[in-house]
Amino acid sequence: MTERLIGIDFGTSTTVVHIKNYTDGRPSDGDGTSIQYVEFDGQGVVPSLIQKVEDTYYFGYDAKQPKKDEKIYRNFKMKLESSDEKEQAEAEKLTLLFFRFLYEAYEEQKVHFGTVQMEKTLISYPAKWTERTRRFMVSCAEQAGFPDVRGMDEPTAAMYSVSVQERERMEALGALEKGRSSYVLMIDMGAGTTDLALCRYKAGAQA
């Protein structure tokens, strides 16, 4: 069975869409540390930015280009839990538009990531968010077109990523020991939130 994991790190200031293919549960390229990215203007990261000019929306790097009579939306992720219902509703609309932009970019580039039998999507969100907002994020990604969407809090997702991509370096530093369980405090500092997660890690086991 071949499958693809699409990882979406929707940040307050920037967003990254990671791609990793697996065959029978193992990395298809034999390298657990290698990751592919959906690119935006040749970059593996895109500003979480929306620009509106009359009835037209621009996203990411396009939204950074000054235009006449523009309206800029930034940090809308942090307004998803606003106590102001109007502000929250606008943030939800903008988030859905942004996710559609991300999905269109993925669809345009997926041919370069190879053919798989199944696709799954993992989206992260701040640990402090309510269950309602977490469900909204999953639903938003689904509405945009992403397949089989699941959610995970950001510090835990960051720990999984670091334990895979930076394992050898962490072992060299003594933060992880081969064959032994380790407790790692993950501090995920973003533009809008800072989350902490205490994780138990052992090579070959789940965190």
What are these model-derived regions, one by one?
Residues 2-28, 167-207:
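Gly/Thr-rich phosphate-binding beta-strand-loop-beta motif of the actin/hexokinase/Hsp70
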Residues 6, 57-58, 151:
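Short conserved micro-motifs on helix faces and helix-strand junctions that flank
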Residues 13, 119, 147:
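Short acidic/polar active-site loop segments enriched in Thr and Asp
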Residues 17-19, 132-137, 161-163, 196:
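A short acidic (Asp/Glu
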Residues 23-144:
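Phosphate-binding loop and its immediate beta->loop->alpha context
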Residues 99-108, 163-167, 198-199:
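Short, well-ordered amphipathic alpha-helices
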Residues 123-126, 152, 187, 197-199:
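Generic beta-strand/beta-sheet core signal
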Residues 137-181, 189-190:
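Hydrophobic, small-residue-rich alpha-helical packing segments that form membrane-like cores
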